[in-house]
Amino acid sequence: MTSISKKKQPETVDDLDFGRMVGELIDHRKIIIALTSFATLIALLYAFFATPIYKADALIQVEQKQANAILSNLSQMLPDSQPQSAPEIALIQSRMILGKTVDDLNLQAVVSPKYFPIFGRGWARLSGEHQGNIQLSRLYVSSSIGDEENPPEFTLKVKDSNRYVIEFGGEEINGKVGELIEKDGITLKIDEINAKPGAEFTIKYVSKLKAIADLQENLSVADQGKDTGILILSYLGDDPLKIKNIVDSISENYLAQNISRQAAQDEKSLEFLNKQLPMVRSDLDSAEDKLNDFRKRNDSVDLSLEAKSVLDQIVNVDNQLNELTFRESEISQLYTKEHPTYKALMEKRKTLQDERGKLNKRVATMPETQQEILRLSRDVESGRAVYMQLLNRQQELNIAKSSAIGNVRIIDSAVTQHKPVKPKKIIVVLAGLFIGLVISVSLVLVRILLRKGIETPEQLEELGINVYASIPVSESNPKNVIAKRLNKRDDSRPKVLLATENPADLAIEAIRGLRTSLHFAMLEARNNLLMISGASPNAGKTFVSSNLSSVISQTGKKVIFIDADLRKGYTHKLFNIKNTNGLSDYLSGRVALDKIINNLQTEGFDYISRGSVPPNPAELLMHNRLAELLEWANKSYDIVILDTPPILAVADAAIIGNYVGTTLLVARFEENTPKEIDISVKRFQNSGVNIKGCILNGVVKKATNKYGYGYNYYDYSYSDKK
């Protein structure tokens, strides 16, 4: 009759409840603490050794654009005259502005002190050992030396405050402060040395485009508030004085560009007027001559009151049309015909032209003499008005040109903040702590998900297997203690029998509990033969069987322990007995039965060793001598315990199992999987052997059991010491 009853399928590894997860994290706390501490330490080192980054900023105001003399009234036609910041921001970040800054500050020359790699610069800053600096006013490297991807780089060594040496391409070039060096494609001038003799500096010459790109990367321009017309320029860098000079240079170059552009607009308008004035004056003189000639021929005919009124209106319309013509010539240089400003001007011109057409129709109804004198008078008046208007505009433009200030002004010059903006030490350390915690917890969770070993008796019971005992890891062996703390198992074989060496050990206490359970479990067995096997090597079946034999013998029962592992049995070492004559020797017929029985020190405890390793263990076990031996032992002893090889490795246990009345399977905690135990049970059943139950060996006390399942086995010890 089998003791195995099929129950529900075991939980999968993915079925992790919150309590078990908390327990696992507590069990792996040392790994979590170690990784988190390591990540925090790295963050601390970075926070203190990383180069501080400072920020310099300046404020610039972009005012509403001043209309020049010709466009003085144009703002009335615009729906919104607020400054547009996006074009100004793009202009500040353009190569035109930044390129001028690169030239002004010689930013193509990158000079940096030489430090020990990685930590050298930070250590020098923390210890106050600064390398000093050098002032370089001119540097040029021929394009034949290096390229944009690999800019030329050379080393400058300070000899004293007035002399230095350049090392480049295996050659040395000696130089003095204030002297220009021109040699081998290198042009260099050092103005000042503020460094100790022996100090080294790296000098790199980058292309202008690369220098501009570096400026664009570290420069930010943004509005300070919506529709304020205030721009804030910010620049990041590790040299407080240098970044201040860079921001000041960018601001000044932007201001100068704005002023020059305004002056250029006035210059173009003035050039246009200078061309128009002579032609307008000539037309005016011609119109006056024609009017005088007409009056002489017609005896000084004067205009009627109606004609004078029409003339005044026509002259007024013509003046407005002429002014629009000037405006159009200026606007055409700034906007396309599709721009709203240009369209508004054209609509106003059409309105004036329509009005002039109506006035011309009124003139057509007058007498011919009045029409002619009206036409000539209109030409004179319109020409005179245009000429005077142009003269006024010319004077205004001359004044505007000489006093152009643009629509930009610098409100606050550049200032570098005293405290660095990067790295934020507290944030860096907290980030390191968080990242270390996330990584360590993730590794633990991945390890848990990948682990498929048995952790609780419930997993075996879900397979329908009775669990007779859960044996904890012995703490008597220091290796076991270390392995327990590291959540590992100890693969080394025991050298002594724990039941005699330390009978108070928790593992032996668990085996005593197993002894009690077996007393009742074997009452219905067909004989008193007990076979103990394992699913796989290192399950601990030898440890369990040998110590179980010892604790049963201590009750006064007559016990014989047989090492039936003919391949790797080692129990003779536990009992300190020579392995000359053993089970294999008896089964092969080389020795008699009485020669293989060893009487141990404990009364009533006999032992049969493995014997010599045979070439055919399975065949020997199928010999009739094994049946005869077991029948004799069954009659001669109260209990016979056999230690057999693991069933998944060899078939020896299946052969022996047909002779015994009780079979127990040993499973290793977190080592054997439920699937391995299930396969082992089926393999025994296929051979006609029924498994009475299972022993869970090597159990480690874990927080997982406390928080996840609520079981803690052998958490207490019992002693008579006070």
From Swiss-Prot:
GO terms for molecular function: ATP binding; protein tyrosine kinase activity. It is a multi-pass membrane protein. Pathway: Glycan metabolism; exopolysaccharide biosynthesis. The keyword Transmembrane applies. Its EC number is 2.7.10.-. The keyword Nucleus does not apply. GO terms for biological process: polysaccharide biosynthetic process. SUPFAM superfamilies: P-loop containing nucleoside triphosphate hydrolases (SSF52540). It comes from the Bacteria. Keywords: ATP-binding, Cell inner membrane, Cell membrane, Exopolysaccharide synthesis, Kinase, Membrane, Nucleotide-binding, Phosphoprotein, Transferase, Transmembrane, Transmembrane helix, Tyrosine-protein kinase. The chain crosses the membrane at residues 31-53, 427-449. It catalyses: L-tyrosyl-[protein] + ATP = O-phospho-L-tyrosyl-[protein] + ADP + H(+). It is found in: Cell inner membrane. It is an enzyme of class 2 (transferase). Its main location: membrane. Belongs to the etk/wzc family. This is Putative tyrosine-protein kinase in cps region. It comes from Klebsiella pneumoniae.
